[in-house]
Amino acid sequence: MRHFLTLNDFSKDEIEQMINLARKIKKEAKTREFKPYLKDQKLAMIFEKSSTRTRVSFDVGMHELGGYALFLSKNDIQIGRGEPIRDTARVISRMCDMAMLRVDKHETLEEFAKFSSVPVINGLSDKFHPVQLMADYLTMLEFSAGEKVAYVGDGNNMTHSWLMLASKLGLELRVATPKGYEVDAGILKMANENAKISGAKIFITNDIKEAVNGADVVTTDTWVSMGQEAEKEKRLKDFAGYCVDENLMSLAKKDAIFLHCLPAYRGYEVSEAVFERHADEIFSEAENRLHAQKGVMVWLDERRR
């Protein structure tokens, strides 16, 4: 049995297997051919953090695969009242076939997975957001984007997940963050170790122009994530100059695509003009959460038999 907590847990071949499954299932769905890959299976969705895309995509995805999803906020279950994670994991995994958690701390996810007897999926944690990166990579393939990726912004869970994806698949990744907001040193070390095997090129800088120059894909994320509201004023000041606008995009390749995991705050991390010019890519990326996650769930199910 396998869990889906971070892309660092998978080989290049395994990641590509999941992506190929996602492409196959998406093609079937476009013709309204919904095969019951997960017939009558139950997905427990545990949310410590609210979401639009994560909730809708997993709920709809499970339904289209022949199963159903159960939404559980932290206030709906005893986790919110102090029940140990290990106990919740053992109860839920006796009643459900799979669990997806969107949590504040990655350690919560690891503890749940340790005591779960069914596959556990990371729907988001403070360290990683791997399901989003599966959607991003699927979108890159669909738009025939090249392999040079520039990430501009906070060294957060999205950046860490890009480091894992790029280092596993052999992509070139350039990360530009303001000083004081760099990526986690331990995660960067893991990425560099992976790169020695895959041939990936990892470049870290504080210079956004250096990062974006000649890029095939430019991506960013919000400057103020959930739980960081108290830091908003300081962050807006520190990230000034890190907006992906038309001038910055002009440094990328002419056919470069722009990705954003959403929600986007126009005028901050991305300009209105760039967002609307690349809206098809961005909303295809959002839709691909549905398809990529189907691929992940089916892949996990196949490997517990």
Curated annotation (Swiss-Prot):
Question: What catalytic activity does the UniProt entry give for this protein?
Answer: carbamoyl phosphate + L-ornithine = L-citrulline + phosphate + H(+)
EC number, UniProt record: 2.1.3.3
Q: What GO molecular function annotation could you give as one example from this UniProt entry?
A: amino acid binding
Cytoplasm as a keyword?
yes
> What is the top-level taxon of the source organism?
Bacteria
Q: Kindly list the positions annotated as binding carbamoyl phosphate.
A: S51, T52, R53, T54, Q78, R102, H129, P130, V131, Q132, C261, L262, R289
A Gene Ontology term for the protein's cellular component: cytoplasm
**Any idea which positions bind L-ornithine?**
N157, D221, S225, M226
Pfam families to which the protein is assigned, alphabetical:
OTCace, OTCace_N
Involved pathway(s): Amino-acid degradation; L-arginine degradation via ADI pathway; carbamoyl phosphate from L-arginine: step 2/2
Which subcellular locations apply to this protein?
Answer: Cytoplasm
Keywords noted in UniProt = Arginine metabolism, Cytoplasm, Transferase
Q: Which family does this protein fall into? A: Belongs to the aspartate/ornithine carbamoyltransferase superfamily. OTCase family.
What HAMAP family has UniProt attached to this entry? OTCase
What is the protein's name according to its record? Ornithine carbamoyltransferase
Q: Which organism is it from?
A: Campylobacter concisus (strain 13826)
Query: Taxonomy-wise, where does this protein's organism fall, top ranks first?
Result: Bacteria, Pseudomonadati, Campylobacterota, Epsilonproteobacteria, Campylobacterales
